[in-house]
Amino acid sequence: ALTEQASKVALTADL
């Protein structure tokens, strides 16, 4: 769950 969320946040914050 943590890895999934971290990946999502990384993509969302990918500037």
From Swiss-Prot:
> Record's Gene Ontology CC terms?
chloroplast
Report the EC code(s) recorded for this entry: 2.7.2.3
Q: What keywords appear on the UniProt entry? A: ATP-binding, Calvin cycle, Chloroplast, Kinase, Nucleotide-binding, Plastid, Transferase
* Keyword Chloroplast in record: yes
Instruction: Give GO BP annotations, semicolon-separated.
Output: reductive pentose-phosphate cycle
- Asked whether the UniProt record includes Ribosomal protein among its keywords, one would answer no
GO MF, one annotated term: ATP binding
What is catalyzed by this enzyme? (2R)-3-phosphoglycerate + ATP = (2R)-3-phospho-glyceroyl phosphate + ADP
Named cofactor requirement(s): Mg(2+)
Superkingdom of this entry's organism? Eukaryota
Primary localization: plastid
Subcellular location per UniProt equals: Plastid, Chloroplast
Pathway the protein takes part in: Carbohydrate biosynthesis; Calvin cycle
- Cystines in this chain: none
Q: What is said about its interaction partners and assembly?
A: Monomer.
Family membership: Belongs to the phosphoglycerate kinase family.
For this entry, the protein name equals: Phosphoglycerate kinase, chloroplastic
Q: Which organism is it from?
A: Physcomitrium patens
| Taxonomic lineage of the native organism | Eukaryota, Viridiplantae, Streptophyta, Embryophyta, Bryophyta
